[in-house]
Regions:
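Short gly/ser/thr-rich secondary-structure transition/capping motifs
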Residues: 17-25, 89, 148-150
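Catalytic core of membrane glycerolipid acyltransferases/transacylases, capturing the structured
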Residues: 9, 17, 30-90, 97
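A short beta-turn/loop motif at secondary-structure boundaries
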Residues: 28-31, 159
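N-terminal membrane-anchoring alpha-helices
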Residues: 1-23
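Short, flexible active-site-adjacent loop segments at beta-strand->alpha-helix junctions, enriched
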Residues: 28, 42-43, 50, 55, ...
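Generic structural signal for residues in well-ordered beta-strands
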Residues: 22-24, 82, 140, 166
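Non-catalytic C-terminal accessory region of glycerolipid acyltransferases
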Residues: 3-4, 93-208
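Short, well-ordered coil/turn elements that cap or connect secondary structure elements
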Residues: 16-19, 56, 135, 161
Length: 208
């Protein structure tokens, strides 16, 4: 954990606790000393803030390349260990960087939908999370984040002081699929299983 991440995590956790009284369930499901993927629904650009504040482990996100486009952004996201990804282009370098981080026993966050959806509506999951999980041979913890759309909807600048909730599901193991990260059928099946578990935590059905 870098000094910058540690400082931002401390300040962010205090801010989130003060403003949002976040309820966290199942934190113990995030394994402590091994590589693990957190796969979450995505309702708001505020999700990473809530998720980081809910978790004691340093988290590494796949962040869109636009966030690295200026000096401050590149310094901030690089210094805190975030992984640059060019959305919509199957960024192989970014996925390999995620695999490398997992093999170093780090925790990597995926938002499989690839963009935000209003409320707790679930979009179709992309297979990048499955490809990485199967190549790195690590468990996936499904995560459900509630109410962040109401806290900071798309296009809004300032968060509302509303309560948030984060639920960490039990880790998913895909032993029978490991080593099949380039198998399209396998990655589609694993992606479906991951999304179904996220949907279950949200109390919804995955319809894709």
């Amino acid at each position: 954990m870098t000094w910058l991440y540690r400082t931002l995590h401390f300040l962010g956790s205090y801010f989130v606790a003060l403003l949002h009284r976040t309820e966290v369930i199942g934190r113990e499901n995030v394994l402590k000393k091994q590589g693990v993927i957190l796969a979450s629904n995505h309702s708001s650009y505020y999700d990473p803030v809530i998720l980081c504040a809910s978790m004691w482990r340093p988290l590494h996100y796949l962040a869109k390349t636009e966030l690295f486009s200026n000096r401050f952004g590149r310094f901030l996201f690089t210094a805190t260990g975030q992984i640059e990804v060019e959305r919509g282009k199957g960024d192989h370098e970014a996925l390999q960087n995620a695999i490398n981080a997992l093999k170093k026993k780090k925790a990597v966050v995926f938002f499989p939908e690839g963009t935000t959806f209003e409320g707790e509506k679930l979009g179709k999951g992309h297979t990048g999370v499955a490809r990485v999980a199967l190549k790195a041979e690590v468990p996936v913890v499904p995560v459900a984040i509630f109410n962040t759309w109401n806290i900071l909807a798309r296009g809004k600048r300032f968060p509302k002081f509303l309560k948030a909730k984060v639920v960490f599901g039990e880790p998913l193991y895909f032993n029978e699929y490991y080593g099949r990260g380039d198998d399209k059928k396998a990655t589609r099946e694993v992606t479906g299983k991951i999304m179904q578990n996220i949907a279950a935590l949200l109390g919804k059905k995955y319809e894709y």
